[in-house]
Amino acid sequence: MSDSDDYLQDDPDDQAFDDFADVASSPPPPKRRRLQARNQTRNTTSRRNEDNSVASDSDSFVVDDDDASKTDELPSPSQASYHFADHPENEASSKYKIFVPKRNNPQENIFVTQLTQPPSPPEMIRGPRWKKPDPPPPPPPAPTKPTPKTTRGPGHEDYGDDEDLDAAIAASLASFEEENSRLSFSTAQNSPPAPVASDNAPTNTAQTESFDFLDDIPDDAFDSDLSLTPPPPAPPSNSSRPSSFMQSSNRPLGVRQTTLFNMATRNQAPQPPQGEQVFAPPEKVEAPTQHKLNQEAISTWVYPTNLGKTRDYQFNITQKGLFHNLLVALPTGLGKTFIAATIMLNWFRWTRDAQIVFVAPTKPLVAQQVSACFGVAGIPRSQTTMLTGEAAPGIRAQEWQDKRVFFMTPQTLINDLKSGIADPKRIVLLVVDEAHRATGGYAYVEVVKFLRRYNQSFRVLALTATPGSTVESVQAVIDGLEISKVEIRTEQSLDIREYVHARNTEVQTFKNSEEMVLCMDLLSKTLQPLVDQLRTLNAYWGRDPMALTAYGLTKSRQQWMLSDAGRNSSFGLKGKVNAIFTVLASLAHGIDLLKYHGITPFYRHLLHFQGNTDGQKGGKYQRQIVQDEHFKKLMNHLSPWTKNPEFIGHPKLEYLKQVVLNHFMDAGEGSAGAEGASQSTTRVMIFVHFRDSAEEVARVLKRYEPMIRPQVFVGQASAKGSDGMNQKTQLGVVQKFKQGTYNTIVATSIGEEGLDIGEVDLIVCYDSSASPIRMLQRMGRTGRKRAGNIVLLLMEGKEEESYIKAKDNYEKMQQMIASGTRFTFHDDKSPRILPPGVKPIVDKRHIDIPEENEEQALPEPKRRGRVPKKPPKKFHMPDNVITGFTKASSLAGGSKRTAQDKRKARTPTPEPVDIPALEDVILTAEQQRELEHRYCTIGDTSPEVIRTPRTDAFPRLQLVSRPTKVVKHGSLTRRMIDALQKMDKTSSDCEGRFKEVLALESRRPAEESLIHQSISRPGNKKRLRKGRSGQPEPRLPPSRVHEEKDEDLDGSQPISPEQLLSSFTDRQGPKPFSSSPRSENLELDADFEAPDLDTLLGRR
């Protein structure tokens, strides 16, 4: 007997209910009616042939023939209204009231996994819920041949005999496979294969029932990505067994997709590994690029596999960096250089002659990136160069003409762009290292702005470990570099967690030692009088001298100077306040050294402060501090302490010594003696803020050589008492640290950014930094290849609070940057560059490194015997610019007038000026007397008479300009002198010669005579014309003057003598006719007077 039989016979509740149905004439419950309706639609033939077997599925109740008399068969829903009509107790009333609907329609079971509406974000207001109406009932299936079933014993259930459930599952899988085929990542589009039908299931029935069942299942029930809109469901094929599920052709995004029954599908086509994503370049409408592209190479992009296993985050970031202006924020040591080298390699392949530029803020960083790109990307060394400011401009110009890949500092790049040495239109890729510096007016920002003026088709890749500490600083980086997308990873990101080793961070806080408390007490008593004076003047509100800071004093000084008291105070009071502020600000730095770095740096600072007061140096208040009794007592205490080599002036320094010693002892350092001391297996790096602190830490650790071999690592600038390190020395220290010559580096901020110092097992932060950028740069130096330790040494109070603030700020900023909701990106300035329709496919392969790249020397330009000359400055013209001059009317949108619209204005003929009579011009006798009496005579005790200048006096001196002091000669004076010089050159026989010339011209034919030609032209009687040589043409000979006067009696104006004389000049030049060999040798008498013009022209 099966479990179903036991359920029907042994359940006392069911038997009581059957007895009550017979007595109360009530219909069966709805559950029994639904089960009976489903049983009637099944194939009843197979059930009759099973004598000793029962269908054990959960939706049917079938009993044996022997037990039929014991159990009443349930009526069908269609017979519910008349099944108990002939029962004798049908009319008896019952105390149980059961609602019986008048119309009953058989309904199939509905499996609902999700809502039927399309997916939508949670913040959107949804509309009313709606369910698709039920389809019309299918026609009754045709009877099929019964299939024998295997008889099983009690307790065995066959869950695969429900054809409806199998068909529904097959239909759901068909829809799921159709969705996966549409989202295929492979290039070949293969339609999913049809499912194989089972032999023991009816074909037509399965098709019909599965179709009805699929209508009630939501379209997106099996979608793995809600951002994709599901396609309409395809007609499913027949399937009766879960073992005959269709095979998926793809799996989106490498996620393991399973069915409702926890069964995974298998893919036939090859697909990307788990975690890798495929991105296509964005489709944009833009002008074609000016770069020459390699049409054969742009169909694929190369991903090097030289370094072994492919990292998913590097693959995905590289793919986005090829097609977008990308800001990459990765923790230190996770392969930002590999990403940059891969992107540079692909753009090198895609273009024929375009140039690629990698910029880094310092020269050591530039040299480090060169070696990394040579060994990873395989870019030929012959096409690569490293340019710095040390190279001559002529050499740099030659390199810009011949090479394609450049490694340089941003300052050198902007200088070459502005001078015209570099062509901005040829640059296709700009890689920016340490991109968090690209704010304000830094060289990175200037380079991008300059390139954008001339080039609209270039890509930007920005690399950094921490983009910024505030929203404003991150937005400034995005604006300065025109970033369109951000890829950020933290140490908690899932795709990089396996590549980041554990880092144990230990935070140790300290209190002031007894020596430090004594020093603070004495210094506080020394500075208290000056602080009280500032408080009396309301210039500073603090009371404790140990709370002084340089920044606080500077702000207080500015506020006091801007206040009414500061503006209205006397100059003496202003000088006093400024002097006190200056002295206190100088000692505020020493207070920080005492609190956070140690007594020895503090003592060095006080010695320098005391040395500035020797003799007459230093101000009044500075000498007042040095001569104070508490200051002298303080110096007497500090001097013997610092001279003791065993003295340690800060509790942090004592703890630092113990931590470093324990680390090297645990690692077995120094156990091999002096011979094995140079082969270190572990490294330690200590970060400090000031050089004095670095030297003090190195002094303490050098006591334990050779176990601890420390080396100070500082910047290039020289400071008081400390010389800087040039770049060659810095690189040498780094190389020795990698080799094991030094196993401990005590570095300032120069060791925080960028430099590949190598694998470090222990990081000790001697002082805390309030900047999240500096904090993360420090902590990122360990935990790259193996587990690392970080020890933070903090003083209680301000330093501890600064660390907590920096840590919280970093975590908050990483979340905001990853979300991208607080920032504005520049997608419009991120061009596609590639032609439309081109979608490169990844080509993972091993890159063959050229033999020339194995050379260890940097690719700097070789020194030449003769340095080439700097080329002339070249001005690059932006695209689509308007050359030439443009009128303001055209800029304002006005229409351009053609030449035909312009009408030439007719110039009127000038009328001759009437010559007034001589009597009207010359003063009368009465006017002359009035002039002399009123204007020429000055009445005084000694009358003075002002006379007109005499032109006849000093004739030789009037031919030249006389020297002046204040008032220079006017234009009239210069003209007068010029006229007198010309008159002086006139010879004595000019009258005779003029007559001869005029006589010769008058006897010539009319066609050749210049006089006749000038008179025959129209208008010559009234105005003066000039000849071709620019000289006035002669008018009339003297012999015909009176004849022309007779002809002009009709009212025309006669020619004046001056006009007639001026027409007789030589056409060949300014030399007058008077110039002759005979007249040049004549010497004029002193009393010679030139002839009158009227007399000259009137004589015949």
UniProtKB/Swiss-Prot annotation:
SMART domains noted in UniProt: DEXDc (SM00487), HELICc (SM00490)
Keywords: ATP-binding, DNA damage, DNA repair, DNA-binding, Helicase, Hydrolase, Nucleotide-binding, Nucleus
Compositionally skewed regions (Basic residues) per UniProt: 863-875, 1019-1028
Acidic residues composition-biased segments: 1-21, 212-223, 1082-1092
Source organism superkingdom: Eukaryota
Region (Disordered): 1-250, 850-913, 1003-1100
Documented EC number(s): 3.6.4.12
Domain Helicase C-terminal: 655-829
Compositionally biased residues, Low complexity: 38-61, 237-249
Record bears the keyword DNA-binding: yes
Compositionally biased intervals (Polar residues): 104-117, 182-191, 200-209, 1053-1066
Annotated GO CC locations: nucleus
Catalytic reaction list: ATP + H2O = ADP + phosphate + H(+)
Pro residues biased stretches: 135-146
One matching Pfam family: ResIII
Compartments reported by the entry: Nucleus
Record-annotated Helicase ATP-binding domain positions: 317-485
Molecular function via GO: 3'-5' DNA helicase activity; ATP binding; ATP hydrolysis activity; four-way junction DNA binding; four-way junction helicase activity
Subunit description: Interacts with the MHF histone-fold complex to form the FANCM-MHF complex.
Family recorded in the similarity comment: Belongs to the DEAD box helicase family. DEAH subfamily. FANCM sub-subfamily.
Function: ATP-dependent DNA helicase involved in DNA damage repair by homologous recombination and in genome maintenance. Capable of unwinding D-loops. Plays a role in limiting crossover recombinants during mitotic DNA double-strand break (DSB) repair. Component of a FANCM-MHF complex which promotes gene conversion at blocked replication forks, probably by reversal of the stalled fork.
Name the UniProt record assigns to this protein: ATP-dependent DNA helicase mph1
Protein source organism: Aspergillus terreus (strain NIH 2624 / FGSC A1156)
